[in-house]
Amino acid sequence: AHRDHAQGLSLFHENFPQIPIYSSKVTKEFLKLQDFLPLCHVLPWRSPVEVAPNLTIELFPSGHLPGASSILLTYLTSSRPYKVFYTGDFSLSKFQLVEGLSLEELRGITPDVLILEATYGTARHPHRRQQEKKLIQQIDDILASEGNILFPVPTLGIGQEILKLLRSHHQFTGRDLDIWVDGKLIFACDLYLKLLREFPSSVQNFANHQSLFWDEQICPRMRHFAEKKNFPLKEKPCIILTDQIEDFTPYFQSHPGNWTVLIPENLTLFFNAKYHHFLALTQPQNVPLETYLLAEHSDGQNTTQLIHNLRPQHLIFVHGKTEYLTDLASLEELQNRYQLHIPTIGTTIELPIGERFIRPQNLPQAYYEGEIKEEENEVIINVSREIQKDIRWHNLADTGIIEARWQGNELVLRGLSQRELFRYKNEGQSNVFDLDCSGNCLYHKNQQCYNPDSPLYGLKVPFEGYCPAFE
């Protein structure tokens, strides 16, 4: 029911009204939030339904979001059945409000074709509970410094996950704290409450003992704004979640304290228009913009686990940056077993079933030649500027400072974020981080670097940031 999947439904239905649209019960309700009339035919979970002669469709809960579905299409012929499994957006991890895609339920399906979303490519993430623990600590640190927090979130999904986490985590149970919700997020939360019977039993049990969302009695209190311009906030620090992202000024002006805006980490990985929009809203008011990780899709490890459990003949990667899809399709463990495809617009893909396995041609991977210079007190690694053309370069070079470690006989480089640098400094790990503070630099103005000789030139740099070109 996320907008990137649902935005074309109305136009599709207008042009092809005779074609039925199928969904899960929860998705049909959620589509009301996307201004799409609920014209869907609801299908039950885990029950094949014949939608055309010899063609059945079966839905499986895919994790990611309540109601999100993976789809098994089976076409029966006199010789054999042909199966296509489409994951949709999926996650194997258990979230606060939704179970992960069950590998046990899929055992034995063995589709001929697997169409797989691969949003994160080969990236590996910490366990879901570790992600939540880190976010809770991040929130706690900001509140401890008397700061307020604003979460701009989508209408569905991660916002409700954060609300449930704050309501149930032991660090916040009974805490004198106000959590406010604004925008369409209010109606989305009401829909969650209406559909509680469709949620995991653990969520239903929690809701039987205390309200899942709205509660002004049990701390932390959770409320919503009755009117757009009426923010009855107290002087104590608070948390606001909203899907209204056009202007943050009313929120910042509603409370005299300092503010921090927290956004999902994935928004900074590419030249994301929404990330730059958030920068434009926060920089002029000197409001820090920090990131957190609550992954909504499976990482590379869980993605390959699903592939090996289903054992398809053909594997089609979709729903991700080309670089990430290519990384995943370049894994030797996949190339040796499956026929791999990355489709492009307007190109037909042939999927011969049952024929002899043909090892796919190696997909082009970018390698960058360079040289090593050994100086008296340091080692310099030079590579071609071609490396900057990759969309991942921006994330690596964000602060201009990297961390290097050995992995077998290979040297792995990783860019360090401003938050990591600040943490290293606080923990007394000075070494390469013992640099002058950006806030005292001649070229640091309005939380931005204006030094053309700095690797941070043109980027947002908070006061505690570090730069090797400090002056």
Give names to the regions the model predicted.
Residues Y275-Q305:
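Generic long, charged, amphipathic alpha-helical segments
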Residues N426-E471:
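Cysteine-centered metal-binding/redox modules
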Residues H5-G8, W45-L101, I218, F225-I239, ...:
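Core dinuclear metal-dependent hydrolase active-site scaffold
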Residues I136-A273, H308-R311, F317-T326, L331-L363, ...:
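Hard-cation-handling environments
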Residues H2, R128-E132, R221, L241-T242, ...:
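A conditional alpha-helix N-cap/helix-loop micro-motif detector
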Residues H2-W180, I186-C189, L196-F199:
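His/Asp/Glu-rich metal-coordinating catalytic cores
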Residues G121-R124, W214-D215, E235-C238, N286-T291:
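Short, basic, glycine/proline-bearing loop/turn elements
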